[in-house]
Amino acid sequence: SQRLLYQNITSIQLFPGVESALCAIARRNVAIAVVTSNQLRNVLAVLGEELAGLVSVFECEAGFFTKARKLRSALRQAGVKPGEAVSFGDESRDIEAARKVGIPCAAVTWGYAHSEVLRHHQPDYLLTSVDQIMGIVAE
């Protein structure tokens, strides 16, 4: 249930290196948007106040068929064109949604889906380490 998920959210931690990557992206004055199927309160609980403050746009509770719409909304709110953005995701539907919107997509192998599943969907980038994020952002 949602209540149980919220109660257990304090045990969820960011993957090592994600915090420093978010800080480095923010230092470059790059807008950060979070588009997720999760609820906002859960996202804020995991990020904490400091990291949440680096995020320009939150689009939460994105369903299977609404992720592309939420991505478009996040771009509009951030004032960013699809070709100027990069989507980072850990599921095949993240790749599909980014494609629908025209955003280059980077699939990360340390999350939900197995790397072979992600590779099959042919993302623009397949990242095996958080350290690779800044190389993509710098392009």
Place the predicted regions along the sequence by residue.
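Conserved Lys-Pro-Asp/Glu-containing loop-to-beta segment of HAD-superfamily phosphomonoesterases
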Residues: 68-96
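Short, acidic loop-to-helix structural element flanking the phosphoryl-transfer center
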Residues: 6-34, 40-44, 68-69
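Acidic, Mg2+-coordinating phosphoryl-transfer loop and its flanking beta/alpha structural elements
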Residues: 86-128
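A short, structured active-site edge motif that brings together acidic residues
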Residues: 52-66
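Short beta->alpha linker loops
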Residues: 13-17, 38-39, 62, 66, ...
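Short, basic/glycine-rich phosphate-binding loops at helix/coil junctions
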Residues: 1-5, 50-56
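Phosphate- and divalent-cation-binding pockets in alpha/beta enzyme and binding domains
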Residues: 42-45, 70, 97, 117, ...
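Core-facing hydrophobic residues within beta-strands of well-ordered domains
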Residues: 22, 54-55, 82
